[in-house]
Amino acid sequence: MNLDIKSYSVLQVLPHLNSGGLVSGAVEISEALQKTGMNSFVASAGGRREREITKAGGKVINFSLGSKNPIIMLLNVYKLSRIIKKYKINIIHARSRAPAWSAYFAAKKMGIPFVTTFHGTYSIQNKLKKKYNSIMVKSDRVIAISRFINNHILSNYNIDKDKIVTIHRGINIERFNYLKVADERLIYLLKKFNIPEDSFVVLLPGRITRWKGHILLIEAIFKLQRSDIICLFVGDSQGRNKYYAELEKILNKFKLKNNFRIIPNQSDMATIYKLADVVVSSSLDPEAFGRVIVEAQAMGRPTISANHGGGSEIIIDGLTGWLFKPGDADDLSDKINKALSLNKDNRDKLAINAIKRAKLNFNNETMCAKTLQVYAELANK
């Protein structure tokens, strides 16, 4: 860098700081900025992960950025412009569409570089929706979180491919380390979730929403006809009470209610992963990246993913896990059976391969370093 990094300030904008991949990315980049000697600012409506940013030295500026109301978005342009001026912001980085519109015009007004991270495919069912999404490619640099997202952008938007940089999401390898999970925590959770010690645990982490494929996994477990399987759905329902009730109804229909646990999001996911004999990502639509797959593999868990989206970039089929035909309960059932049938030697080999790949390709440090490099390139133009 040719500039004094200690006076260099980055403002990230996003709707909230509760949960999800874009929130994790914002928190991690904020911490990396502070560690490097730069100044991190995050504008959002706040949330439960806000303290992680402030604890690391970053500053959170709370106001609503998630509204699609044009008047509020226009007001946010002026709010962001004042923040840019007050804190001498050098780059503004948007991680969501509504904040990106305000950030784009604020960046133009104040003459600073604008970065976006394309976190999902976003719905493009009509021209108006596609126009709304297009703000994510109007930046000076677009970060795609996987090769799948990179290809999606090029296929659907008019953009110079050289403006896009693919930076795979990363995880905290130290946090997701199976050696650091205490046996006492495992015993506690086995009791808490009423899991018999001789059971095989199948885990599906993620929001309780239809496209995550919970019903598909129920069908796959039913096809196995095994009474020794306990399946955990771990994630927030976010008020989707109808879907939750539908899952309960299907479990009753298949007489599987005693084999399933629907559990709210847990802070200690490393222990949840270690409980599992198999971790499944059964998403019906392609995952933009698939962070839970990486987390599970870093923990050395046998992992199964639908063969589309980011999952197919993370798993090497048969070496670090298995890929199944998307939406195919029979194929998913077969892969679960393979995972549960591994002998100790083959299970250990798979764990070694999975951990090595997660550490090498999907670690937090690499993700943050590549993102900060994007900032540096724009700053030095």
Spell out what each predicted region is.
Residues 94-100, 118:
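Short His-centered aromatic/hydrophobic patch
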Residues 244-264:
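Nucleotide-activated donor-binding/catalytic signature segment of Leloir-type glycosyltransferases, i.e.
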Residues 108, 114-145, 151:
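A conserved, positively charged/aromatic
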Residues 302-305, 315:
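Short hydrophobic beta-strand element within catalytic cores of glycosyltransferases
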Residues 43-48, 171, 205, 230-245:
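Glycosyltransferase donor-sugar binding loop
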Residues 6, 12-72, 163, 239:
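N-terminal strand-loop element at the rim of the active site
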Residues 317-318, 322-329, 338-344:
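Conserved acidic donor-binding segment of nucleotide-sugar-dependent glycosyltransferases
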Residues 20-31, 200-223, 245, 330, ...:
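A conserved mid-protein helix/loop that constitutes part of the nucleotide-sugar donor-binding site
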